[in-house]
Amino acid sequence: MIIPMLRILLIVLFVLNLVTSKGVLRKVSGDAAPDKAQEPIDDNEEYDDFIPTIDSSVRLDNTIPVPPALPIGLPIIQITTKEPQPPASLTSLPAAPPSAQVAPPAIRPPEAKRTSLEPPQPSTPQASISSTTTVLIRNPTTSIQQLRGPFDDVRVTTVNIGEIVPDTGNDLGEFRKADLSDNMEKEGNENVKDLVKKTTTVNVTNDYYITSSSPTTVMFELQEDTVGEENVFDFDKLFDKKIYIRNDGSTTENTTEQSTTEKSKTTSTYSTTTTAPVNTTSAPTTTHLGTPGTHKKTCIHVKDLKMVDDSVVVQAGTKKGTIEVSVELGEGDDDEENDDDSSEEEETKPPARHVREDKKPVVWKKFEMNCDEEEDDKGKICKLWAAGGLCGTHKPTMFLFCRKTCLCVGPY
């Protein structure tokens, strides 16, 4: 009897000693410092600014210290009791990498998937680590076990996959249907002339540049012919063209001819036109531009234009050569007469082509400009000429431009 009682007494003494030693350690470590900080402070007693304590949240005021925020990457997750807790041995293992915590179900091995009805299989510590990332397949929710730090409990969260990753297949299908319906509606409202306008604009083809010989022509008329209420570029009126480069004091002439035959954009017939010969002995002037009321325009291909001979250095104001563009197409009205009165023109002129009822045939006339009397934006004599451009201070006429400088017949 004495021996058991002595054993019990020794156990009680050991427990008391252990409890008292824990209390002393707690006071030394500073765990009780927040409790002491809540006690009233005597105003008469002086305190130092520095308190040798481990807890940095202790302040010298009567306010309750704010608990420190959670570390980054450890959100507050509510613990659910529906799922079985993993064994306690997992808490002493190091934390798994983030890729193992939230691995998507599509790339996990097949053996890692098991239904929630199957009991957890006993495994080694290494196998138990991989089991913490197991996805329990359910409909429509999925339970994901996340392994946190070594001193935290393993917490199970329930995630609704439908809310996190919405199905975008239906939205994509609706978008494609709406886009297709809009395109069909637009195509239904457009006629053949609108399609011709889209495919034959000057900016798209980039081969032809518009010029005009009428002083009343404006920019949009240089690009399009007005047909009723719709604007369609008049590409069905193609023509042959001759470009002459003539040097003063010489008898040689360089003639470039190019015949162009193209299927009409608005009709199913083919149109071919020829150019009457031009007398180059007489230099035409601006009087060949025609009456102001007539609407005339032409289209000159860049390849047909020649570069003026720059082997001889010229000064501003000297005449060295001219560019003469002569194009002719169709027949004019009875009131209009062509500048070339030769009899060969009447013989070689093709019969009047069939044109739209609200449009008149166009007759193209000659234009001549001196290339060596104009200076470019850098103050040099123009050498390379091209067709196109529009003058800002002059009314648009039959003109050419040198580099960036636009040249017109003259102000009006």
UniProtKB/Swiss-Prot annotation:
Q: Where is the composition biased (Basic and acidic residues)?
A: 348-357
Q: Origin organism of this chain?
A: Caenorhabditis elegans
Can you say what this protein is called? Uncharacterized protein ZK1290.10
Bias class Polar residues marks the residues at 124-134
Which SMART domains does the record cross-reference, listed alphabetically?
ShKT (SM00254)
The UniProt annotation puts the region (Disordered) at 85-134, 250-294, 327-357
Keywords, ordered alphabetically: Signal
Question: Domain of life of the organism in this record?
Answer: Eukaryota
Ranges of Low complexity compositional bias?
88-105, 250-259, 266-293
Its signal peptide is 1-21
Which residues belong to any copy of the ShKT domain? 371-408
Q: Does the keyword Lyase apply?
A: no
Q: Where is the composition biased (Acidic residues)?
A: 330-347
Protein's UniProt keywords contain Ribosomal protein: no
